[in-house]
Swiss-Prot record:
UniProtKB keywords: Hydrolase, Magnesium, Manganese, Metal-binding
Enzyme class: hydrolase
Function (record text): Probably mediates the hydrolysis of some nucleoside diphosphate derivatives.
UniProt domain Nudix hydrolase: residue ranges: 29-160
Any Gene Ontology biological process: nucleoside diphosphate metabolic process
E.C. numbers: 3.6.1.-
InterPro entries from the UniProt entry: CoAse (IPR045121), NUDIX_hydrolase-like_dom_sf (IPR015797), NUDIX_hydrolase_dom (IPR000086), NUDIX_hydrolase_NudL_CS (IPR000059), Nudix_NudL (IPR023735)
HAMAP family: Nudix_NudL
Co-factor(s): Mn(2+); Mg(2+)
Gene from which the chain derives: nudL
Family as reported in the entry's similarity comment: Belongs to the Nudix hydrolase family. PCD1 subfamily.
Positions that bind Mg(2+): 83, 87
Motif Nudix box, residue numbers: 67-89
Full protein name: Uncharacterized Nudix hydrolase NudL
Amino acid sequence: MEYRSLTLDDFLSRFQLLRPQINRETLNHRQAAVLIPIVRRPQPGLLLTQRSIHLRKHAGQVAFPGGAVDDTDTSVIAAALREAEEEVAIPPSAVEVIGVLPPVDSVTGYQVTPVVGIIPPDLPYRASEDEVSAVFEMPLAQALHLGRYHPLDIYRRGDSHRVWLSWYEQYFVWGMTAGIIRELALQIGVKP
């Protein structure tokens, strides 16, 4: 199923009907979480960030708000909400969490849990100067169009890893972020 137009109700009903299967073995044991913020509009948006070029890891990359689970977090969901507040000033109380996607093993040694949440359209995003250089919204229907993602096989430490690449306006979306978006599309029944 391809989406030229996707309403929030369509997205929510498909996400709720096709619950993710979470029971898979992971390679990494350090926990992290990202928030997949879906902006509540008749034609919903997907909120993304561009990481600061001054960061040691993933500098300048497009990403979801998120990071490592710390000792104060009660769950991976709490970690995703805390990180979203720290990075782009999304109050945890403004997020309607609708579920999680299966965890993803990162090349940096984390098991990353994507948390899907609905946010209001009128939030005043404020990028953390230390971590985020830009905050932008991509139409969800465009983000979930699988034809926009192109595979690239990378060989690292003797193993082959497939990563996905795409552009949105001036933003290069690739790696784990593109993979998570593709997983979300597949989860709601978009066919490759």
